[in-house]
Amino acid sequence: MLETSHMAVAYGAQPRLLTTGLNINDLNEEGRQKALANLKEGVDEAYEVGASGFAFLSGKYEESRKEEAFEALVKSTKEICSYVKSKGNMKVSLEVFDFDVDKKSLIGPADLTLRYAKEIRKDHDHFGLMVDLSHIPLIHETVEESLLPVRDYITHAHIGNCVMKAADMPAYGDAHPRFGFPNSENDVDQVVHYLEVLMQIGYLDGKKRPIVSFEVKPFGDEDPDIDIANAKRTLNEAWARVELAN
């Protein structure tokens, strides 16, 4: 079906961990191994459908044992990267999530993300980072603070929205509401800025076609088709502004 559709596809393994509670930086070795086995099954599926990339996320952690969790994450990531390489040429990405709002993942703030990416890239040149506009406010960073330090490691860019002003607001946290959702953080202006920074750091350089994708979902009884149209209009208007400015 994908071949007939003339589409490129990447495999998101994040739900494999989020829906099961498995954690690849689990300090319990049995738990870490279960998470790894789950992701390896995902790698096999990804190759089966001809995916060009495979993405996952880090797990929750205890602040008092943060360094141990980091070491466990590095160990797991290297195992996944080696497994992927043993099967073919698929790229591997870790998606950067919030560390204290919703997913509460280890990776994370830009300084730790950079340290992590450097460590993995030493041995695995097919590894990179997936950044997400919707997660940047949740990490309490600006676009520049989040992207500039890791510019050399970005291999996938998500565009999305979030609500974080108050925990009792609809769609609070990492819920990916449509652009312009009440009390949300991102709309056309923020997408414009995100695209401009991606251009400045060379991710969108006009020479290659890197992955840029949306992550949005309906809230409540919203019509999915209308939310998809919302995302397309947002990107079209934002890109038109970027082109005018350049």
Would you name each region that the model predicts?
Residues 17-21, 56, 165-171:
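Short acidic/His/Gly/Ser-rich catalytic and metal-binding motifs that mark active-site loops
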Residues 24-128:
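Active-site acidic/histidine proton-transfer and metal-coordination neighborhood
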Residues 1-48, 123-126, 229-246:
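N-terminal pre-domain/capping segments
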